[in-house]
């Protein structure tokens, strides 16, 4: 077995690793192994071009300079696809290296809010599956129930130091449905034990999946990102091995070259131009994979069955929730009990005795206005509020509400890798198109005609889409446009490649006219576009359904703000009305 056959077998080894890398621990190991295998195969192909090994099918000339012998590796269809796979494996290695488990984009403070969010969902479907820790008192006081969100947000530092102290009244809060005032509903509090309904097995399993630990959930998201980005390699590696094998040998022995070297493409700019275009196109594949995994994660994690419209109509209620700050658990179901109040009473807002109704209205208006301006939406940032204590200014950081939106599990830091790959794509495409235009101007002498060449048009369309993606990723309100443009850019690159390599378009310097290869690329283009559009349409449909809960979200967020201030001041509960 010659050394060239070893290089050929390393290509299949890289293909095998590309199929099984997800089972490696950590994932960066599998991505690195696939990258080195494909790099070894590409170097073996280059070693066939440099010594003018005429036994290779793609080596036609023997008198080209050394620099153009190297560039001859990607000057044919098989070599260009091999370079495409090598760049793709390198980008995948960078993505796995940046997405290691210790650098997850799930913030700690977001995890606490997610716990409260899942508790909200569990109360909404009357299946409280979250078993929160009980902080038993060492004294004779009754046991109390806390959530991590309450411990960090609702309860002040001074109040947390003496959390074993009971309140005069309960801090349990209910949000009743004004659409169905005739229905009386009772809900279990956070952590209460209720029998599990067998008919809701799927719903329970999904919520259990959502209520996992932060590290486990972050690891799952990380695997989805890597799987979405490197899944493109599962197509190009078989395509390279099956229909575009660069290591095909001649059936006869050649001692003389079949053709003389063409002096026209022998230009340094022409040799650098194709790798830049390939690097830009493959960078769009990384953005495509990240957005695809983000859409799939958003459909699973954010649009669960309890959040659907039919579930809301079935239960006939808005978001019903309970936030326990320090109430007693008297039975399996919570009942509101107020001191010096009759037995029959309706739940009401906790009102501070030292606060006027005007102050409450101002606070409620602030909550509503902040919601429309985006201040209440959790984007991983917290608003600093100036607090004057004992005559000194103290800057404390306090979130205004819990997350209930498009990024419950993944914070806005997830946009950073997408932004990096968009900039990488646009930069390489700019350099490649600029070099190609310069070479055409001083070599062909046709100037602007170069941009009417189908090959350059195929690379110019992703560049325009990359410019649009930069503008959409900068604005935080255009997440759907960012996802849509990312899933459109890669099919645009694949469609241009398939049109040129199938012979549908005949450019000046085309080197591939095989119809079977073009049909293979077209099938991949249709499959990828169809799956992406289905995912995007489902995401938009679920987002449109979620807009119907805007009023309910306003109520829940504003009441949480009020509950936080009430918990800090240890209010004396006052009923607004009673029977």
From Swiss-Prot:
GO terms for biological process: cytochrome complex assembly. Coiled coil: none annotated. It comes from the Eukaryota. Belongs to the CcmF/CycK/Ccl1/NrfE/CcsA family. This is Probable cytochrome c biosynthesis protein. GO terms for molecular function: heme binding; heme transmembrane transporter activity. Could be involved in assembly and maturation of cytochromes c. May play a role in guidance of apocytochromes and heme groups for the covalent linkage introduced by the cytochrome-c-heme lyase.
């Amino acid at each position: 077995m010659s050394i060239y056959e070893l290089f050929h077998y390393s290509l299949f080894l890289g293909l095998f690793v590309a199929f099984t890398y997800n089972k490696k621990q950590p994932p960066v190991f599998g991505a690195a192994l696939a990258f080195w295998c494909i790099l070894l195969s590409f170097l073996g192909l280059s070693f066939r071009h440099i010594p003018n090994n005429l036994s290779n099918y793609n080596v036609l000339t023997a008198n080209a300079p050394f620099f153009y012998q190297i560039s001859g590796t990607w000057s044919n269809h098989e070599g260009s696809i091999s370079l495409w796979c090598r760049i793709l494996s390198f980008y995948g290695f960078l993505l796995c290296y940046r997405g290691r488990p210790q650098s997850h984009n799930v913030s700690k403070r977001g995890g606490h809010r997610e716990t409260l969010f899942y508790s909200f969902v569990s109360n909404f479907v009357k299946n409280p599956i979250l078993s929160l820790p009980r902080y038993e008192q060492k004294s004779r006081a009754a046991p109390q129930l806390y959530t991590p969100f309450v411990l960090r947000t609702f309860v002040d530092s001074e109040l947390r130091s003496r959390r074993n102290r009971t309140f005069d009244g309960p801090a349990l809060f209910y949000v009743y449905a004004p659409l169905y005032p005739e229905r009386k509903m009772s809900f279990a509090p956070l952590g209460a034990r209720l029998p599990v309904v067998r008919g809701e097995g799927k719903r329970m399993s999904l919520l259990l999946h959502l209520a996992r630990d932060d590290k486990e959930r972050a690891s799952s998201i990380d695997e989805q990102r890597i799987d979405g980005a490197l899944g493109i390699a599962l197509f190009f590696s078989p395509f390279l091995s099956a229909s575009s094998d660069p290591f095909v040998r001649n059936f006869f022995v050649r001692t003389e070259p079949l053709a003389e070297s063409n002096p026209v493409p022998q230009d340094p700019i022409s040799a650098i131009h194709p790798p830049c275009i390939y690097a830009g196109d493959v960078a769009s594949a990384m953005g495509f994979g990240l957005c695809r995994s983000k859409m799939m994660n958003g459909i699973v994690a954010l649009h669960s069955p309890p959040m659907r419209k039919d579930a809301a109509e079935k239960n006939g209620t808005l978001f019903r929730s309970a936030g326990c700050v320090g109430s007693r658990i008297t039975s399996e179901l919570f009942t509101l009990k107020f001191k010096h109040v009759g037995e029959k009473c309706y739940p009401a807002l906790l009102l501070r005795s030292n606060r006027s109704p005007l102050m409450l209205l101002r606070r409620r208006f602030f909550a509503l206005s902040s919601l429309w301006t985006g201040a209440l939406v959790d984007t991983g940032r917290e608003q600093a509020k100036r607090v004057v204590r004992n005559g000194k200014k103290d800057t404390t950081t306090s979130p205004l509400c819990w997350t209930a939106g498009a990024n419950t599990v993944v914070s806005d830091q997830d946009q950073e890798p997408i932004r990096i790959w968009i900039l990488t794509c646009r930069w390489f495409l700019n350099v490649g198109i600029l070099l190609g235009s310069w070479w055409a101007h001083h070599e062909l002498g046709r100037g602007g005609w170069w941009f009417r060449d189908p090959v350059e048009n195929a690379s110019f369309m992703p560049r325009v889409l990359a410019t649009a993606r930069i503008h959409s990723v900068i604005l935080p309100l255009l997440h759907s446009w960012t996802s849509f443009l990312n899933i459109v850019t890669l099919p645009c690159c694949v469609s241009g490649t398939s049109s040129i390599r199938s012979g549908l378009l005949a450019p000046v310097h085309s080197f591939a006219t095989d119809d079977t290869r073009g049909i293979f690329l077209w099938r991949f283009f249709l499959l990828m576009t169809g799956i992406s559009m289905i995912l995007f349409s489902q995401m938009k449909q679920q987002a449109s359904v979620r807009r119907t809960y805007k009023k309910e979200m306003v109520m829940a967020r504003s009441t949480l703000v009020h509950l936080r201030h009430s918990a800090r001041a240890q209010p004396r509960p006052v009923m607004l009305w009673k029977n």
